[in-house]
């Protein structure tokens, strides 16, 4: 009866997924979204060079471009209530801890929505449930090259199972192939490969057990427009002697260039 419970100042926070997709897509349209429900992005096509014959009029091409619309119709929130007794008796700053978790909840929601866009790419390689092979990666790169996709800002978003499979490949981990200075088998970290920025996350669409929708894409394949960045509201509810915290975000996402992205069917 003389041995009280002692609470540690340290806490066990729930683990969080590595959120990597939102930072890998085009967010350049956000300045145009201060008002309104949509952002319309015009397209500009290529023109043809023609041979000029003497004493003949030149031919003018007729421009009939289409627009891609980014609809800003996603309004997400996360909320939590903290009773006064918890806040008073807790040795840690509970309110501060959960404010951080509110931000993570909204960030994960955005990344999750973007992950669903991978399945919208019309081109795919690989087989669900089987790790993406080196040949699959090269095939995806060829599809991008064939479409004249710029060489910079290319990303390979993969599941942890895909990372492990790549660490086992000499071409991805052996210094004879990747040069000195990178030691994936020692650090467990994959460096850039084939001009791709590599990122690993558990936050991918998994059609079934052991399966994952990975992707190789250029930044301009997908667009994210956050019209209202996460905004937190805090008020005291006297009826329940509780602090109420809520955070909201308004955004939209859209596939912009289908041939700039490749769905890699693989393992999870």
Language model regions located:
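N-terminal "assembly arms/tails" that initiate or stabilize quaternary assembly
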Residues: 1-68, 72, 228, 261, ...
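Extended oligomerization regions of viral-like shell subunits
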Residues: 35, 39-43, 138, 143-228
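Short helix/loop capping segments that flank catalytic or ligand/cofactor-binding pockets
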Residues: 49-52, 90, 165-168, 207-208, ...
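Short acidic, glycine/tyrosine-flanked loop/strand segments centered on an H-E-D-like triad
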Residues: 66-88
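Short, structured patches in soluble enzyme cores that scaffold and shape functional sites
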Residues: 84, 158-160, 249
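Alpha-helical scaffold segments that mediate packing/assembly in large oligomeric complexes
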Residues: 85-151, 262-268
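Extended, compositionally biased alpha-helical segments that mediate assembly or anchoring
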Residues: 234-268
